[in-house]
A protein has these predicted regions:
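Short conserved segment of the HATPase_c
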Residues: 144-157
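Conserved micro-motifs of the catalytic ATP-binding
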Residues: 19, 53-58, 91, 95-98
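Conserved glycine-rich
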Residues: 120, 183-184
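Short alpha-helical segment of the dimerization/phosphotransfer core of two-component systems
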Residues: 33-38
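Acidic ATP/Mg2+-coordinating residue in the GHKL
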Residues: 139
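Single conserved hydrophobic/aromatic residue that forms the stacking wall/gate
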Residues: 1-9, 14
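Short beta-strand/loop element within the Bergerat-fold HATPase_c
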Residues: 121-131
Length: 206
């Protein structure tokens, strides 16, 4: 659908000579938004195909929760500011051994999901045990309907609160990335309201 919409919009801009300058400018702006969404969708689908085919070679290295959160949150700083979402991170020197770029992708998808559903804030915390290092992402949004939780990480599943930019891919991709790095991700509702995602990188085989 996204690709078709982009192509149709492009054709309108090129062929319709009766468009006013204002209408043409509005179409160009909308096309830029559609193109950005299309690029993200194509990249995500390619990554999932690579993971499915087993062609991804992970390169584990030592990092910290603070560094991983910083990398994942950086691209979302402006969108959060535009949405007036307050972002706080309580992550420090908790050690994580992982493929940093892929784990940044996984965490970034979770952060993006929380940002899109938050009412006013997104919070990240981290802790380390002898068995795993855990990063928790929480928001103050509507949370999940009970029937959504079992399907949340299924590919192409879109919940009832899914926005127009939600393709049902990001959470599934995050789970794939974590699973192939000896990790897990789960989601739950917070009793006081909002959603919580728990990502774990284990230090041994699970």
């Amino acid at each position: 659908y996204e690709i078709c919409a982009c192509l149709v919009g492009s054709e309108m801009c090129i062929r319709d000579r009766n468009l006013t300058p204002q209408r043409r400018l509005a179409l160009v702006r909308e096309l830029k938004k559609l193109t950005g969404r299309m690029e993200w969708l194509v990249e995500a689908l390619l990554k999932m195909a690579q993971l499915d085919a087993g062609t991804v070679v992970f390169h584990p290295q030592d990092t910290t929760a603070a560094e991983l959160v910083r990398r994942a949150a950086e691209p979302l700083e402006v969108p959060m500011e535009v949405r007036s979402i307050r972002f706080t991170a309580q992550a420090g020197e908790e050690r994580i051994t992982c493929d940093v770029p892929w784990s940044t992708e996984a965490l970034g998808n979770i952060l993006k999901n929380c940002m899109e559903h938050a009412a006013s804030w997104v919070q990240v915390t981290a802790r380390e045990t002898a068995i795993f290092t855990e990063i928790t992402v929480q928001d103050d949004g509507p949370g999940f309907a009970p029937e959504e939780l079992p399907r949340l990480f299924q590919r192409f599943y879109r919940g009832k609160n899914a926005g127009e930019n939600n393709f049902g891919i990001g959470l599934s991709l995050s789970r794939q990335v974590l699973a192939q790095q000896n990790g897990t991700v789960q989601a739950e509702n917070v009793l006081t309201g909002g959603a919580r995602f728990i990502l774990r990188w284990y230090k041994g085989t699970i």
